[in-house]
Each structure stands twice: as structure tokens, then as C-alpha cells.
């Protein structure tokens, strides 16, 4: 009976140590799940961008810019349209640059998802504290945050420039007609 009483506290201590290790990995798994949620949200946000509208705007701009180049404008006309033309070019360039970023961001997000899945799997399949994975998790956290910021900024710029394009394009088309 005395041996059982001595072993019970030892068993309790062992159970506490085991639960601490599992809780540590559980905390890291929770962090990975949160990062996966952010990445999934970013993927969804990029899918909502109407890239067809952007491509159509770029095609219209290409056509209008070629018409402007073909048109023989005198010095007064050039001065009158300079600001609209300049703003139009800036808008079109920003639309183009940011539309090109979308595929890169999609690839980055796909890589992030794979990395997070692998890290989560490593934490889940380990029965011990995985300090060796901590630096990878910190690194991946930084990458996910940076990518999310890039996604947000790219979408914001595309939406702003698409709105500007509609206004500027009508002015350019007035000049052409």
C-alpha cells in the first residue's frame, strides 16, 4: 500500500510533464492554424479581384494610347491634354504593375500554405517539444504577414486605379472624338 502511495505522486508529476509538452505543441499548432486562416483569407481576397475588368481596361488603354499617338496634335492641344494624358499613363501603369503582382502573390500564398501544412504536421506528429521548429514558425509568421500586407496593398491599388481609370478614360475618349 505504501508503494502505491509513493507511485501516485510520481505518476501525477509524469502526467503533468507530458501534458506540458503536448500543450506547448498545441499552442504552436494554434498559431499555425491562425496563419493558415490568414493565408486562406488572402487567397479568397485575390480570387475576388475581377482581373477580367483590369485586363479589359488595359486593352482599352492600349487602343486609346495608340490613337493618341496616331493623331497629329499641335502644341496647344498637347498642353491642354498633358495633365489628363499624364494621369492616364500613371493610372494605366499602376494597373498593369499590380495586375502582374497577382500571379506572384498567388504562388507565394500556395507556397505559404504548403509550408504551414508541413510545420503543423511536424508539430502534430511530435510527442516532444519541438524547439527546432520554432525558428521556422517565426520565419513563416513573418512571411505570412508580409504576404498579407502585399495582397492588401495590391488589391487596394487595383481598386483605386480602376476607379480612376473609368474617369480618366472618359476624358481621354472625349479628346479623341
Please give the residue ranges for each predicted region:
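Generic signature of mature, soluble extracytoplasmic domains
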Residues: 65, 69-107
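Bacterial N-terminal signal peptides that target proteins for export
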Residues: 1-10
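C-terminal motif of bacterial Sec signal peptides marking the signal peptidase cleavage site
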Residues: 16-19
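Immediate post-signal-peptide N-terminus of mature secreted/exported proteins
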Residues: 21-83
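Short, well-ordered helical secondary-structure segments
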Residues: 7-8, 41, 145
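Extracytoplasmic electrostatic interaction patches
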Residues: 89-90, 94-177
